[in-house]
Amino acid sequence: PNYLYWGHSMIKQIKSSDIKKFIEVNPNTVLLDVRTEDEWNTVGKPDTKNLGIKSYFITISQDPSFIDSVKKSINKKEQVLVMCAAGGRSIIAANLLANEGYNTLNISDGFSGNGQDPGWKNLGLPSVIDR
């Protein structure tokens, strides 16, 4: 994996295309989507049931209780794959959580792609739109 310096920590990067392999090797993994509720409802959400991992949907946008919400939901023993639309908000979230003792990886191409890599949805990884 590539490493990206952000503040004083090094957050590992993972592409959406490598997630299935990563989960096979690290079954104690969860996915955390930090986009907004509006994005989840219009663009869709990753559906990780068939990948055998849990997903959590906790927005980072203007939410002062973000870290507390994560602490209530996600165990620090789990590997946390952090996702947003294109990797920008998720690197911030991954860094915040790493500073709290979480083992985080940033999904660098996010749900929708980043111009360089296609992203979760465009790779045909399972997703749903709640209606």
Model-predicted segments: where are they?
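Short, Lys/Arg-enriched N-terminal segments with co-localized hydrophobic residues
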Residues: 1-9
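Rhodanese-like catalytic fold shared by cysteine-dependent sulfurtransferases
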Residues: 10-29, 37-79, 90-131
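Conserved active-site aspartate in kinases
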Residues: 33
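Short, surface-exposed ligand- or partner-binding patches at beta-edge/loop junctions that are enriched
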Residues: 82-83
